[in-house]
Regions:
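Nucleic-acid 5′ end/cap handling module spanning
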Residues: 2-298
Length: 298
């Protein structure tokens, strides 16, 4: 039996001369906290009032192809800040998945089964040198490989290990996953909800900075929609690098609901080629060199 559907207009709350955008956020978030929405909400989307979807100017026609819209912004509560990655399992010299062992001390002194097994993943995102930074510009000059100005083409879009820049972490693309037994007794990689996933699958991950290095990513959901596109030959590798990098920054510098509801206590951040300030590290005069190394040298 088919489930009936209901189609309604979506209500937008605007920032006006009499009502700030923070007041509009407060109305929506208060309704959500009171359970007044019939559907699950996990954040807010901010769109310009005078632009069509995908447009950059008021008279732009709508685009009939997939494109990143730089004028639309999404906010999620800190606990929902996640990144979609294409996972690749570490391999042995024979081409099999590498399986490591961890000794679980103090579990059961009477048991000999205190070794837990895990797999190591490389987390990849979509990367295009023309949009996200050149991997080896010096060699490109030697080879007379000049950059293209066609930034909307996805010809150079490929999966690359995730090296974030803000904050920089050379090990952010490494993820260890404990393998668990399925109903048939086999050892599988699973999300925290019990979904089985394998090599070359797109998975949504959350990040916990309090965990040990290498164990900070937790798989929470298999992205069957994106994985299906990948298997059909489309260039879907999870989040694009600039999206993953932005989400990474939000994970480490979350915008809270209180900031959105009041417009208060929003941290000021100075970001330029010479000095970068943030609440954890203080001033750094090497950001330009770090960004060059992270985006161009690797």
């Amino acid at each position: 039996q088919l489930t009936p559907i209901r189609v309604e207009n979506k209500k937008f709350y605007q920032g006006t001369q009499s009502q700030s955008i923070f007041n509009a956020c407060n109305v929506i978030l208060d309704k959500e906290s009171q359970g007044l929405f019939e559907y699950e909400t996990d954040g807010l989307i901010f769109t310009p009032s005078f632009l069509g979807v995908g447009a950059t100017k008021p008279d732009d026609p709508p685009k009939n192809y997939k494109v990143t819209w730089g004028n639309s912004f999404k906010w999620k509560p800190p606990q929902y800040n996640t990144i979609d990655f294409l996972v690749e399992t570490k391999k042995t010299t024979t081409g099999e998945d590498y399986v490591g062992n961890v000794f679980q001390g103090g579990i059961d002194t009477a048991s000999t089964q205190q070794l837990s097994e895990y797999k190591t993943l490389t987390l990849r995102c979509g990367f295009d040198e023309r949009k996200h930074g050149y991997l080896n510009p010096c060699q490109d000059v030697i080879d007379d490989k000049l950059p293209s100005h066609d930034t909307e083409s996805n010809e150079g879009y490929n999966p690359m290990p995730f090296y974030p820049t803000n904050p920089y972490d050379k090990n952010a693309h490494i993820c260890n996953i404990m393998i668990q037994r399925d109903g048939a007794g086999g050892l599988q990689m699973m999300t925290e909800g019990g979904e089985i996933f394998v090599d070359n699958t797109i998975v949504e991950f959350k990040y916990n900075r309090d965990k040990e290095m290498g164990w900070r990513w937790t798989p929470i959901k298999v992205r069957y929609d994106k994985t299906a596109e990948l298997r059909q030959g489309f260039k879907n590798y999870g989040n694009a690098y600039h999206v993953a990098n932005s989400n990474w920054h939000s994970i480490h510098n979350p915008v809270t609901s209180s900031m959105l509801k009041t417009g208060s206590n929003i941290p000021e951040e100075l970001d330029n080629d010479d000095v970068y300030y943030n609440k954890l590290d203080g001033p750094s005069k090497t950001k330009a060199m770090r960004d060059f190394h992270n985006l161009y040298v690797k």
